Swiss-Prot record:
It is a multi-pass membrane protein. Keywords: Membrane, Transmembrane, Transmembrane helix. The keyword Transmembrane helix applies. The keyword Transmembrane applies. GO terms for cellular component: membrane. Its main location: membrane. This is Transmembrane protein 213R. The chain crosses the membrane at residues 33-50, 55-72. Belongs to the IIV-6 213R family. Pfam families: P9_TM. It is found in: Membrane. InterPro entries: P9_TM. It comes from the Viruses.
Amino acid sequence: MSKQKLWIDDLNSFFGDWSLIPTSKMTREEKLNTITRLILIASLVLLLFGKKDASLYILIIGLIIVIVIYSQEKPSTVEGFEIINGEIVDDEGEKNEIATNLGTPSSYQGGASKGRTIGGVTLPGGRAPIYTCNVTYYPTTMSGNSVMITGKNNALVGPQNPKTLMPPPIAPPLGDLDTWKASEWTTHSHVNSRTVQYEDEAGPFRTFNNNDERVLPVNCLSSYEDDQANNPCFRRYQSGIGIKNEIGIMEPFEHTPNLIKGETPPLIKELDEPYEPTFARRANDEKDIIEPFISELQPGIYSSNIDQPILDNAGLLPDMPQPQTTLFTPMINGKPRDKMQIYVEDKEADAIPGITDSGYHTLDRAYDLPQRYVRERLPKRYGEWRARRSTMPGIPFETPVGYGSGARPIGSFPTEGAVVSPPGNACTGWVTGIENVRDLSGQSEMSEYYNKNKLDMFDVDENAPLYAINPDAVKMHIDVTNRFRSDMQESLMRKRNAEAWQRKMYPLDTNHRRMLGGTGQF
């Protein structure tokens, strides 16, 4: 046993060694002496550079810390073993006989002695066999119990760990579909209802509202433009068996009657214009087919042929029939109006007699156009064209003045339709209707019917008028958004489920895989 003193107890121990860094082989007193030397040298260096306050501060604080630590602990000793005349002598003075030949391990019969306990281990008495290790000089019994270093090998007590006998899991490659592909063993829920087998057999389908209906390309319905494939139209869902999902028309896609050999089938069925409105989904070869269990809305127009029952002239009450209508392009100055198509009646309207005696505007002739605008079942609009009683200054009171026309004295200036006054240009009367107001068809005066709505002069398609297309577009946008969100949620849930199962089946553990026979790679 070697004992050291602190420099407080023995000043010579401070100058006996000039080590500045403590090591693990030093005793506590030697470590404190080394730390004190380091503090003293650091203080002297700071003092040489003019740092008097810092030097004094470090020196005082360091010495106080060393003294306090030393005063609170007991002196420590380094225990060891010495071989004296073939005997191991420990710090307690106990002796253990060992073999004199330490070149190789050997066993011998120890002398008879009573059993004693050292370090919690009871050593056998008598002539128990003793095994001597020539490396550590620590004798151990044949049973494996250590004499001087008890507890060092307790971690290996017992049989072999059974986990070491299990082969390491090696994940199959990503291309192994039999392992990674999803199966029918799926817990279905509102976000996980699709199976891979069904999708492989039936194709992709939308999952919104748990609907298994397949989504196929859009079936374009418009026939206004030549390029029908690029014409915008609303989405239609079709069944997955190659049959059109339309009421009244159930035939395969490939079937096109009266098709010339070598001719490409049309994208949609040709409409029988102008005999039927564009919303009638009937081809030439089908217009004579009698369809049972239907109610007639208009002559030749049935409920089963109408895609949307809220169209312009569809869905009328049975007791209020309307005449047949035709899509008409108005003419202005002998030229068709650009992008303007309206529905007109095939039957010519009756002439409306004028009411000139009561002061109303003259309507005593039949209109030039043989076709009339299609209007709602509303009273004829005499209101806008009814002559009003003038109250303007300079115009005789209650002079009939037409709507939109500028009343002026006769002969005030020569214009088309003006009446030439007698000599002297005297004002002999007032006339109306000199400034003609022309409608879309080039007629000199507006129609006698009310307009249906403010969108009546805009483009319409065969699905619905503009005022009905917009709500449908909004509803479709909401449906598509919800369907996209549902699909994304289901896709994300399936992805997270797959990742969780992969980590559970093949954990990311690569420790000692090469040592246990694995590849060492995940």
